[in-house]
């Protein structure tokens, strides 16, 4: 099945939100062609407060709280740095936590299996974990720049632009 974080991050067809079933299929009340509807079939759910209505007719009395920095980000930053400096399993007296242990703490919190790969495959696992765990938290742009992989990702983003 899918990574359980997917369902905590987005709403998709058939999900319930604010006591209403999402109908993002073509012809559905939330589908393409409906004013303000999704064009992808998905809506962002991460960090949204279901008790706050954004309808223009409702008063906004409850605030949305957006998290700036999370422990998962600290662990992923550490895993990336340790892997780049030494390797996935390096530890010493000053660095008792390995990159693998840090990465797998994040995965365990999401009920995902541990990563056992090494070398370039481990580096790719760290990068994928950042993409999934930190989705919609404004990290991806900076990750792409830091990793210097813009040439590999450019085609993905350009395919989404219709002028």
Model-inferred region functions:
Residues 1-161:
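Acidic/polar-rich alpha-helix caps and helix-coil junctions
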